[in-house]
């Protein structure tokens, strides 16, 4: 079922957003697909909203459900705007990365603390025009959250 954000009930709000690969949304209980329009165009896929472990989760297939977007073409601004529109305050974004350290084996879970982005020529901010673009729930502070102790 597809629901326009304008017609949604507050129970579709989610506290955690997940940008992931296709198929994850199948883990959500009672998932409902929501299509959201943003000032940046549509997000990469409809957002599946459901419950996992007692929490409301919003899942978006980062590259589209049929892998419609190459990594450098993912509409990240639309993806983030859509999540903020749903009330999401925390994002989990698992991804595949490589390592030059032989002690880190394929399939192991790591939390990266460095990112080298060698791409160029794409937008990388919401603030291209002015200091305040009015993103839902936005503020100007950078927030860091401890992943694990």
Description of each model-found segment:
Residues 1-143:
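Metabolite-binding pocket within alpha/beta catalytic cores that recognizes anionic/polar moieties
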Residues 143-149:
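Short, intrinsically disordered, charge-balanced linker/junction segments flanking boundaries
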């Amino acid at each position: 079922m597809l629901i326009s954000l304008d017609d949604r009930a507050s129970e579709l709000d989610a506290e955690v957003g997940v940008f992931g690969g296709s198929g994850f949304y199948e883990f959500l209980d009672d998932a409902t697909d929501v299509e959201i329009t943003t000032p940046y165009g549509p997000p990469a896929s409809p957002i599946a909203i459901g419950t996992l472990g007692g929490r409301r989760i919003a899942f978006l297939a980062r590259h589209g459900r049929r892998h419609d977007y190459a990594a450098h073409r993912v509409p990240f601004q639309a993806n983030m705007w859509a999540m903020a529109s749903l009330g999401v305050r925390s994002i989990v974004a698992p991804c595949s990365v490589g390592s030059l350290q032989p002690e880190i084996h394929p399939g192991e879970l790591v939390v990266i603390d460095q990112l080298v982005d060698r791409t160029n020529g794409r937008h990388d901010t919401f603030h291209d025009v002015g200091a305040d673009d009015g993103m839902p729930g936005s503020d100007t502070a950078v927030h860091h959250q401890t992943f694990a102790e």
